[in-house]
Curated annotation (Swiss-Prot):
Region of interest called Required for nuclear localization, as start-end residue ranges on this chain: 71-191
Protein name from the UniProt record: Speckle-type POZ protein A
Pathway terms, separated by semicolons: Protein modification; protein ubiquitination
Segments of this protein annotated with the region Homodimerization: 297-355
Occurrences of domain BTB (ranges): 173-297
């Protein structure tokens, strides 16, 4: 059994991208040859379809595939009666089928290959099946002594066979590109600074509770905090900020977002968090709250959400709320929230009516647009 060659190192294979792992597939092909000499060829019977077979042969003593060559000296049928037909026959096979390519040639008086013909692909052989050439060589050309193909009236045929065996996969890792860059943990690490109150330089007071924070991070994330610390304001001088109109739990969630960009409890307090995000100019958090509120729009809360969106200039949420009210107009107008809005925010009622009147066709369903996050 021939040894499967090892794949070339990845760096030698190409100058293109280098994969972290690779697989090299070797399709094993067993090649062997066979020579068959027919003495006194001119005495072969000249009936069309007459068959001469060689003895059986194989690639080696342990190969259970047995082959033979088959010649029709005067062709196989009427179409090929002026030709010699030559075929490779699979005599015995332990498998259901094999695939093989073959090449036939004639050896002249000098032992040189001439008149070679070969298969263009690997053919499927089953036991008893043959493949070859019905018109391998013209009889008149073969029998013409001037061509030197029958020295001493001997026809010598040379056959090369390539049998396709099983494929072998070799896989491995590219040792040239094994550097693994760890995932960025910046959000977790900054979150740790907030949770553990390490290296803080300012105090935030919320409803009597004090929270230690970092001015640089607050200023980088919020234009409002940045203005407090940048100018000669009381907060900057005392490193102490009074946070008003924000509940402690909402404040904690806002601070978590400032440090990590995440707000795991957003769905539970989206309305209050929207107000805090608006107050401290946290635009991405604001849109995240809009998206959460939009997904929870209902007939009962549509009017309240519209008021909230208008109060905090949440334009995307406001558009979604108006569209929802238009689609469910008859039901929404029966709710206490709508009736209260008629009294407290008549301009929003007017906006909703204008939108409803300008609609060119009824909505096919409640809006489900995904909000854009800045």
């Amino acid at each position: 059994m021939s040894r499967v060659p090892s794949p070339p190192p990845p760096a030698e294979m190409s100058s293109g991208p280098v994969a972290e792992s690779w697989c090299y597939t070797q399709i094993k092909v067993v090649k062997f040859s066979y020579m068959w000499t027919i003495n006194n060829f001119s005495f072969c019977r000249e009936e069309m379809g007459e068959v001469i077979k060689s003895s059986t042969f194989s690639s080696g003593a342990n190969d259970k595939l047995k082959w033979c060559l088959r010649v029709n000296p005067k062709g196989l049928d009427e179409e090929s009666k002026d030709y010699l037909s030559l075929y490779l026959l699979l005599v015995s096979c332990p498998k259901s089928e094999v695939r093989a390519k073959f090449k036939f040639s004639i050896l002249n008086a000098k032992g040189e290959e001439t008149k070679a013909m070969e298969s263009q692909r690997a053919y499927r052989f089953v036991q008893g099946k043959d493949w070859g050439f019905k018109k391998f060589i013209r009889r008149d050309f073969l029998l013409d002594e001037a061509n030197g193909l029958l020295p001493d009236d001997k026809l010598t045929l040379f056959c090369e066979v390539s049998v396709v065996q099983d494929s072998v996969n070799i896989s491995g890792q590219n040792t040239m590109n094994m550097v693994k860059v760890p995932e960025c943990r910046l959000a977790d690490e900054l979150g740790g600074l907030w949770e553990n109150s390490r290296f803080t330089d300012c105090c935030l007071c919320v409803a009597g509770q004090e929270f230690q924070a970092h001015k640089a991070i607050l200023a980088a994330r919020s234009p409002v905090f940045s203005a407090m610390f940048e100018h000669e304001m009381e907060e900057s001088k005392k490193n102490r900020v009074e946070i008003k109109d924000v509940e402690p739990d909402v404040f904690k969630e806002m601070m978590c977002f400032i440090y990590t960009g995440k707000a795991s409890n957003l769905d539970k307090m989206a309305d209050d968090l929207l107000a805090a995000a608006d107050k401290y100019a946290l635009e991405r958090l604001k849109v995240m709250c809009e998206e959460a509120l939009c997904s929870n729009l209902s007939v009962e809360n549509a009017a309240e959400i519209l008021i909230l969106a208008d109060l905090h200039s949440a334009d995307q949420l406001k558009t979604q709320a108006v569209d929802f009210i238009n689609y469910h107009a008859s039901d929404v107008m029966e709710t206490s929230g709508w009736k209260s809005m008629v009294v407290s925010h008549p301009h929003l009622v007017a906006e909703a009516y204008r939108s409803l009147a300008s609609a060119q066709c009824p909505f096919l369903g409640p809006p489900r647009k995904r909000l854009k996050q800045s």
